[in-house]
Regions:
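A structural signal for short, well-ordered beta-strand segments
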Residues: 55, 89-91, 159-163
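Non-catalytic surface loops within mature trypsin-like serine protease
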Residues: 59, 93-95, 163-165
Length: 204
């Protein structure tokens, strides 16, 4: 933050740390989303079909790091075929509004040929902020252009999980040890600086 204090903003593999969350991710109220698009999606935990999750904390006064990302698509660092064939689901822990870092999205951008980082000013698709209350769900395709607005009055907490297309017969995905997955995620601390167009993207 502006005082130079490092703040934890993500809880990776949160479903492994919270029995309550692990139970919630198996709840039928979430499970029905698997077929909301007619694609019979499955969870992202390798080999199980269950949904995994990570917790996000949006503190006040954060200056760098993974908390408040500018406009981007989740495949901006690659792996489009893996990240963008399903849905990202946000479970609102605190709710979000104009003052507490609501998620910004550009509806329809998942079907448009646009840059994976920054919002092109010539794009004729309007952006909106998803105002939510505690317990609300947000659902978007990861290929949708979206951003995390910095909270200015109250911090925000949210849990993100996801659903993806099941593997087809003959598909093989290299198994990556959990320790390596954790190390890879830990190295993404400067991803904000690598997203093009970070400056000047604070307004809709």
């Amino acid at each position: 933050d502006s005082q130079g204090v490092q703040q934890a903003v993500r809880v990776l593999f949160f479903h492994e740390q919270s029995a309550a969350l692990a139970e919630l991710l198996r709840d039928s109220r979430l499970g029905w989303l698997a077929n909301i698009t007619g694609d019979n999606l499955v969870g992202s935990v390798e080999g199980s079909g269950w949904m995994g999750a990570e917790g996000l904390i949006k503190p006040l006064d954060i200056k760098t790091g993974l908390s408040d990302l500018p406009w981007h698509k989740d495949c901006g660092q690659g792996r489009h075929s893996y990240y963008c064939n399903g849905l990202t689901i946000g479970i609102s822990v605190t709710g979000a509004d104009e003052r507490s870092g609501a998620l910004g999205v550009v509806p329809g951008s998942h079907r448009a040929y646009v840059q994976t980082a920054r919002r092109d000013p010539s794009l004729d698709l309007p952006a909106i902020k998803l105002v939510s209350q505690t317990g609300d769900l947000t659902v978007h395709c990861s290929d949708t252009l979206h951003r995390a607005y910095p909270p200015i009055e109250r911090p925000r907490k949210v849990v993100y999980t996801g659903l993806q297309q099941p593997l087809m017969q003959g598909d093989l995905i290299e198994e990556v040890p959990v320790e390596q997955q954790r190390a890879t995620r830990a190295r993404l601390t400067n991803v904000r600086d690598r997203i093009a167009g970070a400056a000047g993207q604070d307004s809709l």
